Amino acid sequence: EFVFDEHPKPQEIEIFLEGHPQNNLLQHTCWSQVKENWAMKQVVVRRGGTIRAYAMILIRSLPLGLKLFYIPHGPIVNYQDEALIRFFFTKLKKLARRSHAVTIRFDPNLIDRTYPYAKRNEERGDHQQGNVIQLLSTLKCKHKGYTLYLKEATQPRFQAVMLQENMSWEALNAKTRRSIRHAEKCGVMIHEGEDQLNHFAEVMKLTEHRKKI
């Protein structure tokens, strides 16, 4: 039996995210701190006490006491589990109505297709997430389509990924290597790992203010 929990503990959310293949920065609490003009609410679905689904909802106030719900790169859930999806989205819609939210916008962190950058202009087969879109459409969710324009998507649809095993100095192009050397000469220090992500989030926030984003 599924249970919808609107007051999960932060520690258990972090544990759930760390072990989930859809884990991403935009569903962590630190991202809500960057989006300081939005309120935030975290919800989970449990089965047998174990978290099975999670969403960090960013909430924006609109005129007339209305709200906008946005779940960036989420919810984090097994989209192949139809019973779980139906339960979760039913509860999310009830929460939205109770909060006077006029819409729930979300963009799941699912990989539709992968291909080498050099083959980006070649024809490819069918989209891999068609069954997920079909399931969500039965819950009255509207797919915005596979737009190629950034202005028509809340988050970029395309992500350039370099596998860790391929991240060698030799794999970088000459321009990138020159840029790194120039940055090092200017005193920029490069650190790898996750221990300073909170500081990175603060830098993003300062950039947001400076650029008036």
Segments and roles (model prediction):
Residues 2-8, 129-213:
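Acyltransferase donor/substrate-recognition loop-hinge adjacent to the catalytic core
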Residues 11-24, 51-60, 139-155:
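An N-terminal domain-start capping segment
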Residues 5-48:
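N-terminal charged segments
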Residues 84-88, 128, 213:
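Soluble or luminal CAZymes and related metallo-dependent hydrolases
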Residues 119-133:
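A charged helix-plus-loop insertion that forms the helical arch/lid used to bind
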Residues 32-121:
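Conserved donor-binding loop and adjoining core beta-sheet/short helix segment
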Residues 84-85, 124-125, 172:
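Charged, low-complexity surface patches
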